């Protein structure tokens, strides 16, 4: 992860000023979204992973991951991580990166986009975050042994919008003989699985950030909520639950950061990246189940109300858990790798992390 405290502080300040969950809860409309997006775009955060020669900020992979983790701490309900991922994909396919919001497809392992012999795109992809709000959709495509990236104008696709568990916009996107603005091969050693692993790591970092936020919320509530003439934090059962929540949070943050560091520092070590990123998505997904249950237990009925901000974090965690493969899907792939390598290779694989 990035050591650039100025970047982290600047990102945090933007979110504190324009994306405070309590202020969003009280907002009467969505006008705050455009203000927030403008601030992020003007600061260069939306194009952090786009090289300078493509008009971006040219930040490192580690810097981008730090931006994403901070976004998770605020449960940012706009397509910043998706736009960062879209910019990374396009620039790694030598495609000029447009301004504005981007969605990335597919985010479900079984969904596919295909290229017809005439060059048009076909396929149906489900649950695409922020597709209805995006200006462009970036599609990753497996084609004849290579991986292609396509930039598509959203208005050329059929968008069937719905709300995710958190209320944030999602959509089923239908590509029906759609002409892309540009289609190029993904460069270097990057593959279709690389895209999935990058997406999984991004969601793991967001999950880790959001779990840090709900740990703070639950701990503060336990210190101030009085029952039987003393704060509930004094009760052993509550202390035990908070300790479990802290453990889940620490594990999620550690494994997500480990995956991010591997992607940033060993970009050509495909097996290490797969092991780290798949493990991160499995472990953070498990932490979502345990952590959100505990947070709602500690806060009780108030945590379920529309007025309280806890649901802004927990419901987004439930959404993020399934994006780019849930823990069950990644566990199958990770188990297959371990079985393929054989029992003798398992211990060295674990101890060299």
Language model features with spans:
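FAD-binding core of flavoproteins
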Residues: 75-78, 88, 92-212, 216, ...
């Amino acid at each position: 992860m990035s050591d650039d405290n100025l970047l982290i502080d600047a990102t945090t300040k933007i979110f504190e000023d324009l994306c405070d969950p309590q202020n969003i809860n009280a907002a009467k409309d969505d006008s705050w979204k455009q203000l927030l997006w403008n601030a992020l775009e003007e600061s260069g955060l939306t194009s952090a992973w786009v090289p300078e020669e493509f008009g971006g900020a040219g930040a490192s992979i580690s810097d981008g991951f730090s931006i994403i983790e901070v976004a998770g701490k605020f449960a940012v309900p706009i397509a910043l991580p998706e736009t960062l991922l879209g910019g990374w994909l396009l620039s790694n396919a030598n495609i000029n990166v447009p301004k504005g919001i981007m969605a990335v497809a597919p985010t479900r392992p079984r969904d596919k986009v295909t290229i017809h012999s005439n060059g048009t795109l076909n396929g149906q992809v489900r649950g695409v975050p922020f597709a209805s709000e995006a200006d462009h959709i970036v599609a990753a495509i497996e084609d004849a042994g290579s991986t292609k990236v396509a930039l598509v104008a959203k208005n050329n696709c059929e968008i069937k919008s719905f709300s995710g568990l958190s209320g944030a916009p999602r959509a089923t996107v239908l590509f029906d003989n759609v002409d892309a603005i540009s289609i190029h091969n993904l460069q270097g050693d990057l593959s279709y699985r690389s895209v999935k692993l990058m997406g999984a790591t991004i969601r793991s970092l967001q999950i880790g950030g959001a779990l840090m936020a709900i740990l703070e919320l639950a701990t503060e509530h336990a210190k101030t909520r009085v029952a039987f003439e003393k704060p509930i934090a004094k009760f052993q059962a509550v202390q035990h639950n908070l300790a479990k929540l802290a453990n889940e949070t620490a594990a999620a943050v550690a494994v997500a950061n480990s995956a991010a560091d591997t992607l940033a520092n060993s970009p050509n070590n495909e097996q290490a990246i797969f092991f780290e990123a798949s493990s991160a998505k499995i472990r953070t997904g498990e932490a979502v189940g345990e952590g959100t249950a505990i947070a709602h237990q500690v806060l009780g009925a108030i945590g379920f109300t529309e007025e309280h901000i806890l649901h802004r974090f927990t419901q987004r965690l439930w959404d993020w858990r399934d994006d780019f493969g849930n823990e069950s899907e990644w566990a199958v792939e990770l188990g297959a790798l371990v079985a393929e390598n054989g029992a003798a290779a398992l211990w060295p694989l674990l101890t060299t992390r």
